[in-house]
Amino acid sequence: IRPLIPLLIAAGILLGGNGLQGTLIALRGAQEGFAPSTIGLMGTAYFGGFLLGCLAISRIMKAVGHVRAFSALAAIASAGTLLLVLMIDPATWSAIRFASGFCFAGLFTVIESWLNSGVANRDRARVLAFYRIIDIGAVTGAQFLIPVFGADGFSVFAVMSIMITLSLVPVSLGDRSNPVPPADVRLDLGRVWRISPVGVIGCVAVGITNSAFRTLSPVYAEQIGMSVTNVVTFVSAGIVGGALIQYPLGYLSDRWERRAVLLLTTAGALGAALALVFFAGSGPLANFVLVFIFGAFAMPLFSLSAAHANDRA
């Protein structure tokens, strides 16, 4: 794992910057008077760019290699972060978020393909588990930079740009090998549907739900009267809940009927979401507990749906 340490450091810095951006966009947008629907559309733009980036990055890596692809995409993402605070306008922010989604999809693909190519099969699960720990830790920790620097000024945007730029250093100075790029992606949604309608419906529904949570949960928390510190704690509680329960639910679904686990997990997420609606005014602690439970049930649903589809592939 030692040769991969620079790459994992870069991943941690980059993931922290990306996780910080999602929450900050929602908070700053609300402060600027953007409607929740407008902030939601910005989230849609980000994930649209992310989808396109997933489809295009293999060609970029084949053309210029991993290091150059990473450097170019990180530079664009860093510049876009600064443009957010220089050009405060919903349409401009949506365009920047689309470009950011494209860049971050490419950056994560570069990192993950590099990790996979640089580790033996016997060590792969441990390395990827360590990567996921870094992911959750960086995203959760970065949230608390918002109350430190404030969401209403330039400083926190500069910090995000610095984090994205610094991720270039370990990649540029670390392992100079050039792994084989991933194969081109071809979508055949009809075939996927024929293999597992339940898996397709689950992945699509969970993708919509969880992306809406990541985009709009800061706005919801602010509108029910939470302070900035409590807003980022609320968002972090949902993320941590999903991280902690991923493995136990995966373990259960490997041993029980997977559709039954999917049904029970969906019911748990629905119950927690309804409880959040009814107990919104009950104080921060109740909301932290409920959003933790929501994340614990909602976040693993994608993995469970994908596993169900893979069972039939």
Regions found by a protein language model. Give the residues of each.
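Helix-to-loop junctions at the C-terminal end of transmembrane segments
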Residues: 53-66, 150, 245-257
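Intracellular juxtamembrane helix-capping segments at the cytosolic ends
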Residues: 106-119, 299-313
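C-terminal membrane-cytosol helix-exit motif in multi-pass small-molecule transporters
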Residues: 147, 161-181
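C-terminal transmembrane helical hairpin of 12-TM major facilitator-type secondary transporters
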Residues: 259-303
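Helix-loop boundary and gating motifs at the non-cytosolic
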Residues: 1-47, 197-202, 210-220, 224, ...
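Short hydrophobic/alpha-helical segments at membrane-entry points of transmembrane helices
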Residues: 7, 91-97, 199, 283-290
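Structural signature of the two symmetry-related core transmembrane helices
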Residues: 68-82, 161, 260-275
